[in-house]
């Protein structure tokens, strides 16, 4: 029998992208709810309990409600794309490349929390340096990022694309999260293995899909002997053999004059760069990804495939 997959929230931005990625797959049976019935709790509960894997593309509270609907059904496994369970100890964090053992944790899990888009890039850069002993305890990490506006869901898409919208946003680029309490900070801290919460400054650009995440570092405040080359080597070693995450060679990075945030739009890949001057005082770590790809829907499908391979 084919595994049954139900996307709860399939008509939203992330859910639609997951459907696109599953189109044409003959190895799955997709359960679906009509858009007009998407708030029909009884119908949702029935579909959730009929699935082998339920992928939740819902706001946090609705995701918690969906989890409660299948609490007594040990057969149903869940991938939650909301923020609700990303730092919960009994949920596997769905960043498969985070550790060598993470794919198996995802395969074995009943509950998988899909990472946030910004944390995917930040953790990809920070965690290997913590594990290699390069980034010391207590280092004051800063994360700066820009995302495509689809990361804000249907509401922001309408605000950015419809100039007749009463809340139209005409700015080509804007900062938000100005109180420094963005909901992605806790997972950056936990899964980045940080002792202190990072200072996180997110922003949105006037492009639909794409993302750049930056982590600038002072070399003199890192472990003794840390250089541009040792940092790059730590990332290369960590992601050796990975097909989705690419660490760009230093000589290639050195030739770049700019990075286009939309380069990987429509892709589920992620590129990591280390920039700096040989013998210089600073390095800038950069992750490039699609906020709806490896940053959301692509990761959800990757996690689903891992769970089905158990």
Curated annotation (Swiss-Prot):
Entry's EC annotation: 1.2.1.38
Keyword Metal-binding listed: no
SUPFAM superfamilies: Glyceraldehyde-3-phosphate dehydrogenase-like, C-terminal domain, NAD(P)-binding Rossmann-fold domains
Active site: 117
Molecular function per GO: N-acetyl-gamma-glutamyl-phosphate reductase activity; NAD binding
Broad enzyme group: oxidoreductase
Keyword hit for Signal: no
A Pfam entry, by short name: Semialdhyde_dhC_1
Functional pathway: Amino-acid biosynthesis; L-arginine biosynthesis; N(2)-acetyl-L-ornithine from L-glutamate: step 3/4
Alphabetized Gene3D superfamilies for the sequence: Dihydrodipicolinate Reductase, domain 2, NAD(P)-binding Rossmann-like Domain
GO BP of this protein: L-arginine biosynthetic process
Coarse class of the protein's main subcellular location: cytoplasm
Catalytic activity: N-acetyl-L-glutamate 5-semialdehyde + phosphate + NADP(+) = N-acetyl-L-glutamyl 5-phosphate + NADPH + H(+)
Keywords: Amino-acid biosynthesis, Arginine biosynthesis, Cytoplasm, NADP, Oxidoreductase
Superkingdom classification of source: Bacteria
Compartments in which it is found: Cytoplasm
Matching InterPro entries: AGPR_AS, AGPR_type-2, NAD(P)-bd_dom_sf, NAGSA_dehydrogenase, Semialdehyde_DH_NAD-bd
GO cellular component, as recorded: cytoplasm
Family indicated by similarity: Belongs to the NAGSA dehydrogenase family. Type 2 subfamily.
Function according to Swiss-Prot or TrEMBL: Catalyzes the NADPH-dependent reduction of N-acetyl-5-glutamyl phosphate to yield N-acetyl-L-glutamate 5-semialdehyde.
Protein name as catalogued: N-acetyl-gamma-glutamyl-phosphate reductase
Source species of the chain: Rhizobium meliloti (strain 1021) (Ensifer meliloti)
